[in-house]
Amino acid sequence: GYTALALDMYGDGKQASHPDDAKKFAGAVRQNMDVAEARFNAGLELLKQQPNVNSSQLAAIGYCFGGGLVLAMARRGLDIDAVASFHGSLGTQSPAQPGTIKTRIAVFNGADDPMSKAEQVVAFKEEMDKAGADYMLVDYPGTMHAFTNPDADELGAKFGLPLKYSAEADKDSWEQMQVFLKESFK
């Protein structure tokens, strides 16, 4: 099994009850990545101190905003075994430089996600290749944003967003992540 820690990356216990709030909170984090990195590293240090944690086998997993955030931390040289991003943002204002990425990366993406356009996928692959990253990207055809969230269809309808759950992509991405983590912790 694994020990998990959920980080409050928005800060101050903020919770988004509407997509506009989430956009505002996430935007504030993206505007100050040094603060985000400090917050992330504080959580990582707290996790390492737990008696049931093997600090030589660490991974970060994120969904949506969190998925983009774990990729940003990898680009900034996060020194852990693995990061996994589920329908996270692939774009960046600060592309990884060669030799910067120290962690293995797994990205699970909806090929029809308008929040992660095909050109962003191509740019991400080019960036990772140029950086010499050890990464995998699984692009699920016919799959939209939030494909791992069983409530995605309802939330998409409620807020007018292109969200759609995919039981198949959800199951496959989870299974692939399990294998990815086992391989990363060898």
Question: What residues fall within each predicted segment?
Answer:
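Gly/Ala-rich beta-loop-alpha elbow adjacent to hydrolase catalytic centers
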Residues: 62-66, 70
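Serine-hydrolase catalytic machinery in alpha/beta-hydrolase-like enzymes
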Residues: 1-52, 150-164
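Acidic catalytic loop of the alpha/beta-hydrolase fold
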Residues: 112-116, 145-146
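A conserved short beta-strand
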Residues: 79-89
